Amino acid sequence: MATKKAGGGSRNGRDSAGRRLGVKKTDGQYVIPGNIIVRQRGTKIHPGTNVGLGKDHTIFALIEGRVEFLTKRNHKIVNVKGIAST
């Protein structure tokens, strides 16, 4: 007879790494084309003018300019306002 009971494996004790989601550039910040503005799951924030939407719903800048967040009809929208060239 065994004097020690078989040790049951612990079924907890692990955690996945955070996904680093969220707003990466805030209102009024300067961006260049390709800069990521928001990383998100689903379209919590919708793309506006001069921004693109990636297949994973990442919003990124298409032009050089300043980031602008606004709310229209209960939708958060992000735009990039271009800088007037001199």
Swiss-Prot record:
GO molecular function: structural constituent of ribosome
Entry keyword set: Ribonucleoprotein, Ribosomal protein
Signal peptide per UniProt: none
GO BP field: translation
Short name of one Pfam family: Ribosomal_L27
Region (Disordered): 1-24
Coiled-coil intervals, chain numbering: none
InterPro entries for the chain: Ribosomal_bL27, Ribosomal_bL27_CS
SUPFAM superfamilies named in the record: Ribosomal L27 protein-like
Biased composition (Gly residues): 1-11
Transmembrane segments: none
Ribonucleoprotein found in the keyword field: yes
Family of this protein: Belongs to the bacterial ribosomal protein bL27 family.
HAMAP family for this protein: Ribosomal_bL27
NCBIfam families documented for this protein: L27
Name recorded for this polypeptide: Large ribosomal subunit protein bL27
Native species: Rickettsia africae (strain ESF-5)
Gene expressing this chain: rpmA
